[in-house]
Amino acid sequence: MAYMCADSGNLMAIAQQVIQQQQQQQQQQQRHHHHHHLPPPPPPQSMAPHHHQQKHHHHHQQMPAMPQAPPSSHGQIPGQLAYGGGAAWPAGEHFFADAFGASAGDAVFSDLAAAADFDSDGWMESLIGDAPFQDSDLERLIFTTPPPPVPSPPPTHAAATATATAATAAPRPEAAPALLPQPAAATPVACSSPSPSSADASCSAPILQSLLSCSRAAATDPGLAAAELASVRAAATDAGDPSERLAFYFADALSRRLACGTGAPPSAEPDARFASDELTLCYKTLNDACPYSKFAHLTANQAILEATGAATKIHIVDFGIVQGIQWAALLQALATRPEGKPTRIRITGVPSPLLGPQPAASLAATNTRLRDFAKLLGVDFEFVPLLRPVHELNKSDFLVEPDEAVAVNFMLQLYHLLGDSDELVRRVLRLAKSLSPAVVTLGEYEVSLNRAGFVDRFANALSYYRSLFESLDVAMTRDSPERVRVERWMFGERIQRAVGPEEGADRTERMAGSSEWQTLMEWCGFEPVPLSNYARSQADLLLWNYDSKYKYSLVELPPAFLSLAWEKRPLLTVSAWR
């Protein structure tokens, strides 16, 4: 089985746990030498299921049963994956087992001993204080520029007095609170898009119904919309219940849209770098409080592990790699699989377009982290960055060898390529198809914000973010400054991009639901690969680490999508294709 790490983003934490396991084994052997018989030592405390949250209550229900792992293509049971929840199910009888077993041998432990000289705290701090924000996986979730001051939308003459009075009392986004240290966490979040009518029903709070009314009036009667919006802004607050907080950020975005619609000058853009560390800590807070990213990485990695079977050479093509956080657990699982570790693992990294025109330095740091970690595992590893824009790449750039098992990964990445035309998405998918992959893993937000008109898009986004705000409200206290930061600098920015003033080519928050992705994937020649019962059960076990009142569940969407849902509303969807 692969070793469990409570923080799947911290590569060195995994290695340190393995060293701890080795030390316990050595102590056990010494005791056995002197006493001939001793019971096995307990698992390390770091292996125990745990979840760092501001509010946490343990489950009292029975732990979900785990089925037998599905056989690989070579007739053997695939390796065991790690996830950030802090627990794992081995293929054998015991809940906790030897991390490497006989197949790994003592040579692996001798390699891992070098981790004692590796400063894991320094590595984590480097992600916060040294590298620019855009050089991390956070760019997949957060817009780097903080919101500028909100211009008040000019109302009609009849509404001028009411608007001015309410605008004076209405709260405005303020500077982020001071940095607080956060527990380390894994990585990406996401969503499902109901019809406009069901979206209206799910946003039944009066303040949200008023927002929906404002959005409908925005195009036809901006003055009326401004007057109604003033009342909403007076009642909304970023410190209230989920509906009040949601209204706070949506009213802000709609206010900007109305202002720009009347020809108001754009606000000056502040320095995009100033909130880098703040956003990094927000990202960690969210992933410590909610299982979104853990679910996505766990499920995609399990599909890759099963599809590659006992292949001796494995080539992963990651469209959108930055830190490579997703691959720590998979490298661990491949290094400890029953069939033996691969003779070579190669990752080809295509940088996200949001890394900017010069991603080389960021990817070099990613290369170093992954290479050093693979060395600790005793794995022959190669990282190859492709620095040309994705639309300029062709099959020959990937240097696929005939005896390699290829896996292509799109983790919260393809939606960046959506636009008024799907041509760029289709081009990239056809490129992936040309590599003859054993599997293509796709993780996307489950909400329709691409082709929908503004009113429907506003309703879809409001319903989606309502679920996110509620899930965070259960995980963190109302007075938590960390919660305020996450909602302001992560969710607030994305709301701004989805329903703010930008339209056409300037609108960058273009997500699509699973049915739209199914159409695109099948058009490009892919067919769905059902996720195994084992992958489903691992995801169930991940959710078991969260309190039952969190109301998380797994929802299967046809033909082969698995979604993480809040109160049965899908938020993040993962699928596999070939």
From Swiss-Prot:
- List, alphabetically, the GO terms of the cellular component aspect: nucleus
* Taxonomic superkingdom: Eukaryota
Residue segments, region Disordered:
18-84, 146-173
Biased composition of type Basic residues is found at 49-61
Q: Name one Pfam family in it.
A: GRAS
Q: Domain GRAS spans what residues?
A: 198-578
What's the reported outcome of changing residue 284 to E?
A: Loss of DNA-binding
Q: Where is this motif: LXXLL motif?
A: 414-418
Stretch list, region SAW:
500-578
Instruction: Return the Pro residues bias intervals.
Output: 146-156
Q: What does this protein do?
A: Probable transcription factor involved in plant development. Involved in environmental abiotic stress resistance. May increase the expression of stress-responsive genes. Binds DNA in vitro.
Q: What is this protein called?
A: SCARECROW-LIKE protein 7
- Which source organism does the UniProt entry give? Oryza sativa subsp. japonica (Rice)
